[in-house]
């Protein structure tokens, strides 16, 4: 059961090129070795097959095709499978696809059902993805404005820091009584995307389902299942007046049935929008990238192809994207780590045309990239499974890479106090890395080493799975999904404290933010905790929002904007209104 439980975490799809087929009485299978994620298979023309994958027991046996079906039997009942399994074969574009007809063997069914196989010799060949750009209602936008005071332009704010001092936020608030609630506006649909702020506008995205019962499943669990919701969606971008909560405009970017599935804990609008005060950009995965001016006029839209993400070695699980776009120097930058065709992409913010595109040998990841100003120049840093990487954002050229991450990565890199902090939280690795921006080349640590010229310090077993870490006032805070909250000295890595947070409930997906010596934490059940920053843990208050919380708050001009499952709240002292 432990093996089967661990199987519910992975996915990869790879491409297939034409080859010579074996002669048999049914569907023609390739004679060469095939690859599917971490699995290698050989279907011998004589009727035997071998299938093996990293950390999996080998599956060997006999095969026979009849028409468009294949029957598989295991030698000696290997893997506890004595009966045959039957699968329908089809061409999936340039791939060979297996779809379940009947099979009582669970391990075989998990591996094979809905799988698409490629020639092993062709897996490293990454094809060009077609990117289609369309002009919108207006001519290209003006030159971008400089960062506005009080802006929170992307996920976790400037440089993904999550910090905005000078807010004078309250410690306590109550939506039921209205205490320190400036306004609350209902937002239709489902979304885990976070709010962003520029000037007097707050932007949020959503996906409105045609099924009124569409939902997601919060909580701490290991299931990797995709949601059964494939209902027709309307992907939306909303602009609200940040002073009153009034919806200023709303735009439908796309309508239709989703091209990809989503995780049962996910939505079809996970990616946070981004803005530079000139344009606001929303990315809806396979449904496209959309850029609007600040009045809601569509400037351009780009189809970057299928964005297929999921568990890295069980391709039947589709989880959907969560990485968010960022804007740097009029470039819209996207991190697209998918099943077979991973890349970084920089689009012209004025036209949507490709400025540069860098291919990546990566499995799916969900973190948002970060661009930071360093003493050695700007760096674009990405968190992913094979390597943490830094690039020159001007041209997409790689500057350095660091191995040792978890197989599933979601937190966003953070730049603070002249170091990059990058973590990931899937066992067994769960690393924390603190990296100097002067790093160049491959700076992967040799086994057993924790530091180097490039790595200030590192550790394993303490990285967070979903929440992005927080660097504040010389300390690093790491929040685990299960409510363990760790504090470290940023310079040395010394543990200051480890605290089990109260009211863990369904767990934590939202990332912590900080202002004026206080840290704000949101659990999925809708409880917001306020604690003091510093070497001593002190819990100041717990504030119930009465609704599920998955998104990360935004801070701007004395107000904290909190996105719940159904609403957007503005929290601040009444004098801020």
Where do the language-model regions lie?
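Bacterial N-terminal signal peptides
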Residues: 8-19
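Noncatalytic, solvent-exposed loop/strand surfaces
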Residues: 24, 78-80, 86, 114-117, ...
């Amino acid at each position: 059961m432990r093996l089967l439980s661990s199987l519910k975490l992975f996915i990869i799809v790879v491409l297939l090129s034409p080859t010579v087929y074996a002669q048999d009485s049914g569907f023609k299978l390739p004679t060469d070795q095939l690859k599917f994620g971490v699995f290698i298979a050989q279907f011998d023309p004589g009727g035997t097959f071998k299938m093996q994958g990293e950390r999996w027991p080998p599956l060997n046996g006999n095969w026979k095709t009849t028409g468009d079906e294949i029957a598989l039997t295991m030698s000696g009942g290997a893997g506890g499978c004595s009966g045959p399994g039957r699968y329908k074969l089809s061409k999936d574009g340039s791939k060979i696809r297996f779809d379940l007809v009947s099979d009582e063997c669970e391990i075989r069914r998990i591996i094979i059902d809905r799988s698409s196989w490629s020639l092993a010799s062709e897996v490293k060949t990454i094809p060009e993805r077609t990117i289609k750009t369309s002009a919108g209602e207006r001519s290209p936008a003006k030159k971008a404005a400089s960062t506005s005071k009080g802006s929170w332009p992307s996920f976790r704010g400037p440089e993904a820091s999550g910090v905005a001092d000078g807010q004078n936020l309250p410690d306590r608030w109550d939506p039921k009584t209205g205490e320190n609630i400036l306004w609350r506006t209902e937002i239709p649909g489902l979304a885990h995307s976070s709010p962003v702020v520029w000037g007097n506008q707050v932007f949020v995205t959503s996906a409105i389902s045609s099924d009124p019962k569409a939902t997601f499943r919060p909580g701490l669990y290991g299931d990797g299942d995709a949601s059964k919701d494939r209902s027709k969606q309307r992907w939306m971008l909303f602009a609200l007046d940040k002073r009153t909560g009034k919806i200023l405009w709303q735009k439908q970017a796309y309508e239709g049935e989703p091209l990809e599935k989503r995780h049962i804990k996910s939505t079809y609008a996970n990616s946070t929008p981004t803005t530079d005060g000139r344009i606001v950009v929303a990315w809806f995965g396979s449904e496209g990238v959309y850029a609007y001016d600040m009045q809601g006029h569509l400037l351009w839209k780009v189809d970057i192809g299928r964005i297929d993400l999921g568990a890295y070695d069980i391709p039947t699980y589709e989880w959907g994207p969560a990485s968010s776009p960022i804007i740097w120097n009029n470039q819209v930058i996207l991190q697209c780590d998918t099943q077979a065709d991973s890349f970084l992409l920089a689009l012209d913010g004025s036209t949507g045309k490709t400025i540069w595109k860098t291919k990546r040998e990566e499995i799916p990841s969900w973190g948002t990239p970060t661009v930071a100003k360093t003493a050695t120049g700007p760096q674009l840093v990405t968190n992913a499974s094979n390597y943490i990487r830094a690039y020159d954002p001007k041209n997409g050229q790689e500057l350095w890479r660091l191995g040792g991450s978890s197989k599933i990565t979601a937190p966003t890199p953070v730049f603070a106090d002249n170091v990059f902090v990058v973590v990931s939280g899937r066992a067994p690795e769960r690393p924390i890395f603190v990296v100097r921006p002067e790093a160049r080349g491959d700076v992967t640590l040799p086994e057993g080493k924790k530091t180097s010229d490039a790595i200030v310090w590192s550790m394993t077993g303490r990285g967070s799975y979903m929440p992005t870490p927080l660097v504040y006032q010389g300390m690093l805070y790491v929040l685990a999904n299960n409510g363990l909250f760790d504090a470290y000295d940023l310079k040395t890595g010394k543990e200051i404290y480890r605290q089990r947070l109260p009211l863990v409930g369904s767990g934590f997906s939202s990332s912590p933010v900080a202002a004026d010596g206080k840290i704000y934490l949101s659990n999925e059940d809708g409880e917001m905790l306020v604690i003091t920053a510093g070497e001593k843990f002190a819990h100041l208050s717990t504030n119930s929002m009465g609704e599920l919380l998955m998104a990360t708050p935004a801070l701007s001009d004395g107000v904290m904007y909190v996105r719940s499952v159904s609403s957007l709240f503005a929290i601040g002292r009444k004098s801020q209104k």
